[in-house]
Amino acid sequence: MIWSDPYLVIRRVNILLSGIDVVPFNTTYTDALGNTRRLNESMKAEARFLRAYFYFELVKRYGGVPIIGDKVYELNENIELPRSTFEQCIKYIVSELDDIKDDLRSLPLPDAAASAHVVNTQAAQALKIRVLLYAASPLFNEKPIESGNGGTATAARMHE
């Protein structure tokens, strides 16, 4: 994986997020709890999941990276963003996953075939656990248990 590939995906997600509400489609679905939801809200949440996932892939390889947020830069635009710290990146990823959890679909979905290609609440929770465990690991935290940073304990409690 090279540096630019994840940012290309992040840019495409930002383009989708900036334009999805312009497209008029009123498709709804019924979630596992019987609530009626708008499909475009789930699509936005799934796109934000992908953005969080690709930021995590960048952070695993490079440590802190520039965070673009929702901004859509033009392809020929000169972008000079400061590199965010590792902690800022982890907080951004976790906040993205926390923000989308209520808009993602929950298992089981009515159509088993459709379930294979849907980012659901459980996937977001699993990624959040992985991010927090990675952040609390000795690779980035010399004393993961003794330091009291809460990362290890928070990740361990996520399964509840």
What annotation goes with each model-predicted range?
Residues V9-I10, N14, Q125-L132:
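Well-ordered alpha-helical segments within folded domains of soluble proteins
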Residues D21, G63, G69-Y73, L97, ...:
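Short, small-residue-rich loop/turn micro-motifs
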Residues K44, R51, L58, T121, ...:
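Structural register within alpha-helical repeat arrays
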Residues E57-P66, P108, V131-K143:
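Short coil/turn linking the two alpha-helices of tandem helical-hairpin repeats
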Residues G64-P66, A114-A126:
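Aromatic-lined, polymer-binding surfaces characteristic
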Residues D98, L127-L133, K143-S147, A153:
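Internal, well-ordered domain-core segments that constitute the primary functional module
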